[in-house]
A protein has these predicted regions:
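AAA+/P-loop NTPase substrate/partner-engagement loops
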Residues: 36-68
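Conserved nucleotide-binding/hydrolysis micro-motifs of P-loop NTPases
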Residues: 24, 55-57, 79-81, 107-112, ...
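Pre-Walker A (pre-P-loop) alpha-helix and adjacent loop at the N terminus of AAA/AAA+ ATPase modules
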Residues: 1-14
């Protein structure tokens, strides 16, 4: 990856593949990764753009690349990319000397399909991150982190309720995803915001907030409908 930025010749190497099951957090991972590079200030100096491969097929690829010059282009559901678009993008990458980073996102099957569209295109994606299947404890840690980013804290009893919610959506043939956990948190936040009388009482008794002014999510907010 560092070679991609150090060479400054073109975007013919060091581009990234992020693969994993649907809803596993590929886009969140890619976005966080790009923010780190942008914060450093020396690698990515341009804008970040995200586009679905099916939508990219209908665009002027050169114009899309021009908009994110020196930044990053994330192509979601990369397996839907057309052969002609992959070839055009490969050509543009060979002549891109601005340090632009290109990221493909999809399941392993989708990535394999995308790379089969054009040999030159495939050769430019030399780095890969495979998003793992998360345990329930890891999903809860994600939920706590996601809540904190939004200004909330999950109390101890609510953590138990969250564990139950996650267990209840487990499937034998498919791992529980970060997207599903995110939806549970979003639902809890919505319930907290519309809890009426209980909310008014908690505000008056100062039980709604932590010492660092985060809103507390309680057990009731995680109960299934």
């Amino acid at each position: 990856m560092l070679d991609h930025f150090n060479r400054k010749e073109n975007a013919s190497t060091g581009n990234l593949i992020i693969q994993g099951e649907q809803g596993c957090g590929k886009t969140m991972l890619a976005t966080s990764f790009i923010k780190v590079l942008q914060k450093d200030g020396e690698q990515l100096t341009g804008k970040m753009g995200k586009i679905d491969a099916a939508a990219l097929n209908k665009k002027d690829v050169q114009q899309v690349v021009r908009k994110i010059t020196g930044g990053c282009l994330i192509i979601e559901r990369a397996g839907d990319i057309d052969r002609s678009i992959a070839a055009k993008l490969s050509f543009l990458m060979e002549h891109d000397i601005t340090g632009t980073l290109y990221i493909l996102e999809d399941t392993s099957k989708g990535i394999k399909k995308a790379l089969s569209m054009d040999e030159g295109f495939a050769s430019k994606f030399t780095e890969k991150i495979s998003v793992p299947i998360f345990t329930n404890d890891e999903l809860v840690l994600f939920a706590k982190s996601y809540s904190a980013e939004l200004g909330y804290k999950i109390d101890e009893m609510a953590i138990l309720a969250l564990h139950n919610r996650i267990s209840n959506i487990e499937r034998i043939d498919q791992a529980t995803t970060l997207t599903e956990v995110k939806d549970i948190i979003d639902e809890a936040i919505d319930r907290e915001a519309h809890s009426g009388l209980k909310k008014a009482i908690s505000i008056l008794t100062a039980k709604r907030y932590t010492d660092d002014d985060r809103i507390v999510l309680k057990e009731d907010h995680f109960r299934e409908k």
